[in-house]
Curated annotation (Swiss-Prot):
Species this chain originates from: Porphyromonas gingivalis (strain ATCC BAA-308 / W83)
Keyword terms of this UniProt record: Cytoplasm, Methyltransferase, rRNA processing, S-adenosyl-L-methionine, Transferase
Protein name in UniProt: Ribosomal RNA small subunit methyltransferase G
UniProt gene name: rsmG
Major site of localization recorded for this protein: cytoplasm
Pfam families linked to this entry: GidB
PANTHER family: S-ADENOSYL-L-METHIONINE-DEPENDENT METHYLTRANSFERASES SUPERFAMILY PROTEIN
UniProt-listed InterPro entries: rRNA_ssu_MeTfrase_G, SAM-dependent_MTases_sf
Length: 221
């Protein structure tokens, strides 16, 4: 078994849980995930982007949860992804570490949250990440996929996202579309898309109890 190096005391423990489910990370990726703890602890004390009582659960509730999108699809190199309503950088920043050859645009309508996401991405050396303070209606680009984390109801999200999806150059295992992280009972929310949407339960693939109600929803657009 590979020995996991001791983490600096200034960083919250928890990167072991990332390596548990993603054991083939490069040394650079491991370093970036480790650095996230200290960076978010610092920035969250200045600008509240994560509940302060939840910052100790950063790796389980935020980083690993974000990486649940990779359980639905492994993005191919050259894919372009929009993280809509990124907040402080979730799910976009963990995904950008996992997929260094994929380009990510992280967008939020709240400027102080974008400031945190931008600072963290820069500190991590994520050259594949851009950030933008704007609303979805102001985005003038198209993307292969849009990801989000419980931003709004699926029907509202789909309506906003349709015009932002690139129709040509389909290169991934799933057609271009929307992938979002959801929790709780989704039957009513997914009903209008029952013939198109795919739902993936994160538990027991992620065996921690936190994930028992967590799902990934994919909708081709």
């Amino acid at each position: 078994m590979q020995e996991i190096p001791e983490k600096p005391l200034s960083q919250p423990a928890g990167t072991e849980i990332i390596e548990k489910y993603f054991p083939h990370l490069s040394e650079r990726q491991r370093e970036q995930f480790e650095q996230m703890g200290g960076l978010y602890t610092h920035w969250n004390a200045l600008i509240n982007v994560i509940s302060r009582k939840d910052i100790d659960n950063l790796y389980l509730h935020h980083v690993l949860h974000s990486l649940g999108i990779a359980r639905m699809l492994n993005f191919k190199p050259g894919t372009s992804v929009l993280d809509l309503g990124t907040g402080g950088g979730f799910p976009g920043i963990p995904l950008a570490i996992l997929f260094p050859q994929v380009s990510f645009l992280l967008v939020d309508s709240i400027g102080k949250k974008v400031k945190v996401a931008s600072a963290v991405a820069e500190a991590l050396g994520l050259d594949n990440v851009r950030t933008m303070h704007c609303r979805a209606e102001s985005i003038g680009e198209k993307f292969d996929f849009i990801v989000s984390r419980a931003v709004m109801k699926l029907s509202e999200l789909a309506k906003i996202c349709r015009k932002l999806i690139r129709r040509e150059d389909q290169q991934n295992a799933l057609p271009n579309g929307l992938i979002c992280l959801k929790g709780g009972e989704l039957q009513h929310e997914i009903l209008p898309f029952r013939n198109k949407a795919m739902t993936e339960e994160l538990w027991p693939t992620f065996e921690e109890e936190y994930f028992k109600t967590k799902k990934v929803v994919y909708l081709p657009l």
